[in-house]
Amino acid sequence: MVGAGQVILIDPNEERLKTARENRLAGEYLSVTGQEAAEAVKGLTEGRGADAVIEAAGTEASFTLAWEAARPNGIVALVAMYEKDPVLPLTRMYGKNLIFKTGGVDAADCRELLELLREGKLITDFLITHRGPLSQILEGYDTFEHKKDGCIKWVVTAE
């Protein structure tokens, strides 16, 4: 993460956590979830909480963890696709003054990201675990959605 002082990665899936460790995606790796994870983040940040949180799982529990782990005035970036809208428990959030950012890839940053990829400064090859032609897209999406065979990303190839 460019410019990040400390990166804490949380994932209850041991296989994904192993992949993250092997590719040195963070300085700290946690397999705990919920309140235990939020408390662990506070412990690793001298009680402050995270300056910024990227929520990429898309569950009610991961959304709750994201805002609970963030420090007051922190940023919570929601990049996951939620099946249903998360509930904002405003009475519990009151006083945190959080900044929420939503959405997928910002086209304004694509040039910078492509340059980092070209220069070899951003390595993403390990994320592509499965490939297949467009004619198998439904099978590929099913594999991706249900994380079959350790799928992280399924990429469409030329037929």
PLM regions and their residue ranges:
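Adenosine-nucleotide cofactor-binding segment
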Residues: 1-63
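Conserved acidic E/D residue at the C-terminus of a beta-strand in Rossmann-like folds
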Residues: 11, 80, 104
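Alpha-helical segments flanking ligand/cofactor-binding loops in enzyme cores
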Residues: 18, 64-68, 91
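Conserved beta-strand scaffold positions in the cores of enzyme catalytic domains, especially
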Residues: 28-29, 100, 127, 131
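C-terminal hydrophobic helical "lid"/dimerization subdomain
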Residues: 64-68, 107-159
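Helix-to-beta-strand junctions that scaffold the AdoMet/dcAdoMet cofactor pocket
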Residues: 70-72
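Short glycine-centered segments of the SAM/dcSAM-binding site in methyltransferase folds
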Residues: 74-75, 99
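Rossmann-fold NAD(P)-binding glycine/threonine-rich loop
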Residues: 79-97, 108-115
